[in-house]
A protein has these predicted regions:
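A structural motif
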Residues: 106-126
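Active-site-adjacent, His/Asp/Glu-enriched structural segments that form or flank metal-binding
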Residues: 120-122, 138-141
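Peri-catalytic and regulatory segments of divalent metal-dependent proteins
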Residues: 1-109, 127-134, 141-174
Length: 174
């Protein structure tokens, strides 16, 4: 739920605007807002809307850590990750569809449902791996451009790494 606290939202907008100026995305406007949710998360939406969960806000230990997360999310918007994810998902769907057709064909030719199921499992795995690889690439790209924005806006660039380290400790070993 939207966190309807003008002071908090003004604070978020103030920090985010300092970073967004450095992104210089051809007039892209950004709107930063709080979300009443205890989980440690932030997200970017089409149109430059960036939500920051209250759980994340309260876990940052300084302004640069919060700014680091915001810079990362701005990076997702500026790099058009949402649009690119849509295109990538369509590619994964085509891979899965090709696998389904291949599975039917293999099953029909061999007369073995197991062979068809094997082809289907391989194609689903390939489609999932495409998505994972794309997501990792996007996260690294958002980090890379975000750290540049963070530094240019006058925040301590170590804030981004510091908060990611905090998140790692809170989540525990994987």
């Amino acid at each position: 739920a939207y966190f309807d606290d003008p002071e908090t939202n003004e604070f978020l907008q103030s920090i985010g605007s300092r970073i967004a100026v450095e992104a210089q995305d051809g007039g892209q406007t950004f709107t930063f807002f709080g979300v009443r949710d205890k989980s440690i998360n932030a997200f970017a939406l089409p149109g430059g809307f960036i939500g920051m969960n209250t759980g994340l806000i309260t876990r940052t230990s300084n302004e640069s850590e919060l700014a680091g997360v915001m810079a990362h999310e701005i990076g997702h918007v500026v790099q058009r990750h949402i649009a690119r994810a849509y295109v990538a998902q369509r590619g994964s769907s085509l891979t899965a569809l090709a696998g389904l057709l291949g599975a039917v064909l293999i099953g029909a030719v061999t007369g073995s449902a197991d062979a068809g199921m094997g082809v289907m499992a391989i194609s689903q795995g390939a489609a999932m791996q495409q998505q994972i690889n794309f997501t990792r690439m996007e996260e690294h790209e958002a980090d890379r451009v975000g750290i540049g924005y963070l530094s240019a806006a006058g925040f301590d660039p170590d804030g981004m790494a510091g908060f990611f380290s905090t998140m790692g400790r809170l989540q525990g070993p994987s």
